[in-house]
Amino acid sequence: MSVSDVVEIVSQSAVSFTQPSISIQSVPSVTIGSIAFETVGQITTSSTTSTSLDVFDTTLYRSAKYVIQVTDTTNNLYHFCELMVLHNGLIAFVTEYASLYSSYSLMSFDASISGTSLFVTGTPTNPNNTVKIYRVAVGV
């Protein structure tokens, strides 16, 4: 199977796979119903100013959960957390939880709405970081 091949499975009951196994090496996005699972990407920071981490359409998604890993590349420090974002069309609400630090928090997070776009931003504690971001978004 190549990257451009499409496999569609439609079933009214449970589906199981035994042989051959399926290995998915790289999938940027999977949508099941109104839930989208996405690799947002990797961002590099070089200052302590607020940085855009992600943006999504508020007419498509009501909420999102992020898994975020921040690596301070200068001091070899690490920060891993989950972030939940919810909006009512006018205001974005955000909370960080399940946070682990090798020393201290490396980034604070915020969210805002402009028009029909919800922006998630991060403000680094130290200037040189690599940020890896994964998102699960739930439809309106």
Language-model-detected regions and their locations in the chain:
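Low-complexity intrinsically disordered segments
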Residues: 95-140
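Surface-exposed ligand/attachment interfaces on beta-rich extracellular proteins
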Residues: 35-63, 71-77, 118, 125
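Extracellular attachment/recognition segments
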Residues: 72-112
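Short amphipathic beta-strand/extended segments with alternating polar/hydrophobic composition
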Residues: 18-19, 78-86, 132-135
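A broadly conserved detector of short glycine/acidic/proline-rich loop/turn motifs that flank catalytic sites
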Residues: 21, 28, 70-72, 124, ...
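Short linear motifs in intrinsically disordered
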Residues: 20, 24, 54-59, 107-112
